[in-house]
């Protein structure tokens, strides 16, 4: 997939600092990155590649040897063995050696820094920090001979890992105060400010270095720091004038010597909309710094267009297209300038590589029809010339340009649908066998009417070349099916036609399997996409008929594909979502792990599995998933400054801006914020049966205050949606939507995969904010109980400490506001549902959130019997309705109900049980042998005591009903379930329904010869077993049920214990 590959490439660019190799690099590499040796700058790019490959660090010995003599006067021969021991991870030996070194040099800050580094590597963080502070104290003494860059850089490494970068910064600042003319120390201080993202102090330090050394690079460091202030801190744009003045003064006295410096200057002028000034710079002597003519022309064209000199920009872009006819972005710029349409710049300014839009706005209102015709005719002439020049090549750009022109005509109102269809057909005849055809024409299909879309599919079928080579016929057939999916035409076909089409594709796949017999397993096979298309058809057939056999058949088809070639990510993602739907979540998680998601892909791809895991009882796997994701994100956010500083050092200033903005984008990721909250809530869910453990967790969470602060922060910021939704199946375009859960009548066409960021952002923000309030509300609810019980006995008041109750009420108001209503309306809603006046459907997809509200609303006024009754009725109604809805259904057809029950029992019911535990603890005598006092006697007869007992009894009974359903499912013999799974695929003779594709595949496998398909494919075909696949699916479903049953039994036992304790009250 094109964009998947894009992110794999970007991983290497953006995440050197957090890659697996980087984490294990010896510290010498890190120290070398911090030092000021010129040899480091000379071959910076080579060093980055070396870092990425994890190259051994012995080659650094020569550079390091020159530094060792400066480390407080310690000879290199005494230090080298310590570094060798650290490099080989022999930390005990290294500690022994450094202890010996300190005996000889007790006042050496460098020796102490080495000791701190060793302690940190051994996981002794407290000892490491203590030693760092000792070294810092020595550095602050008057003996200037003890202060050198190697000591400071070693301390910086340790302190950064200990999250005390401020101490390292203070050490460097002190050193720079002592050595105001030491460039190396000032560079170290600049690096500290880079790590702190302190752009103002970066600027100030860079200016000092520039004044000291007069080097161009330090001035550009300052300019980049100013640009970052404007971009990230939203500082006044007057700073840009300051930066421009500094550059002009430098150019007047020293000129410029690097292309990157020129690019910074031009970007600075562009930020201020000084396009004519930028053009003047580019056309002057400095323009000669850009050696590649096309690059220079692109900049010139952009500046001319933004200066509204469209005619000159058109001439420039024509030159570029003559030099590079396949430059698609350039053609769009050319056409935009020709039509004086500035919307193209808005598109490219805001282009999102994760969510690229297929539609580009076009403006025509300012053009008369005559003007439009004249200019579009000029564009057509250019395109025809480019096509003639590229006639014997495989360039798609000139032919795609013809489609763009026809689309512009159509949007202008020329009513040229037939001409556009003809151009699409011609493009098919030339490139229809390529896998990219469907994605190339998607934007042009969207402007056609439904009838024309259906007619276009028929045109493709009629004009496909059956006499061409087998690979070309296969490619064209695949393209036609993909276009049929894009147009939604397939959703209007009768069921039997879809079945027939799927069978035809299965036969085509089998017939062409021999074309791939000599391919390497890593290479894509011919017709590989056919199995994905077949599975999409089968899923649609299931949606229409609710016949589980179609889903089972889709599973079999995709598993066969993975058996033949296990590297196809499309098969894994489709299986992941099908397994998730039928409740075989362990297999779904297995398929996700098989994607081998690493680095930035954890941010863009984990949406495929995260939501399902959050709604499942598979807490161990969920915990690992969250830990891995948060570790990558936290490591990147902590260490991304390493790469930013490398960009500064290597004079790659555009990357400086890019890396900082990329870091900010990840930092504001909605998924990252959600995962941080979910990780904390998961801990509470896992330990909800132990009151003492919950208190410990809440204490670690600062009583939930930190997450409340996070909720407030999220409310005032714009979240970034980095998930790559283009990789999701059609039936679940985003994690919150699954068309299979509703009837087929609700949608009659395949929804276009469009950017859903705008419509999701507010909902996601509110969901994260609501979740962030849970730990604090749990804490406050627990704090309310002792006073509430006391006041219930003494005054029958509302109960609870006034301040605590007031805060809880405020949070409840915030919570309901995030649910879209007021507190009073929310109370009315849950009351009516508990009484049966409204159905649970009124709660929508936020059912669990509403139940959470009801739990804490009850905790806010524990002495109200009415509140207890409403809450009890809600639990009973919402849980038993689901149990009755599932009835005798098997897991495959009711897993969505199981997901809801899992959430109810592990969240609101768990929090309510926790509050009951707090009530029980407060109501019981503190000593085992202590007799009941008067307060206890009064409590036993108080209304609240009876309400607690009734609630415990109801919850026990309700959970037992859930457990009974789970036991009924688990008591079904595994072999019987496997047989039932396979029975859905069996059919009589030529009857329609599930099993037809499976029949084609099984017949082919039975008759296939090794000489025909090759040894590897032949062995894979013979190893494929439908019974094994069915058994794995059933076992995965049973594992989910067992995990859920274990949770239910744990809750029931807790409630039984609480029932016994309350009987003594």
UniProtKB/Swiss-Prot annotation:
Primary localisation category: cytoplasm
Keyword list, A-Z: Cytoplasm, TPR repeat
Domain of life: Eukaryota
SUPFAM superfamilies, A to Z: TPR-like
Keyword presence, Cytoplasm: yes
One Pfam entry name: NatB_MDM20
Compartments, as annotated in UniProt: Cytoplasm
Protein name: N-terminal acetyltransferase B complex auxiliary subunit NAA25
Species classification: Eukaryota, Viridiplantae, Streptophyta, Embryophyta, Tracheophyta
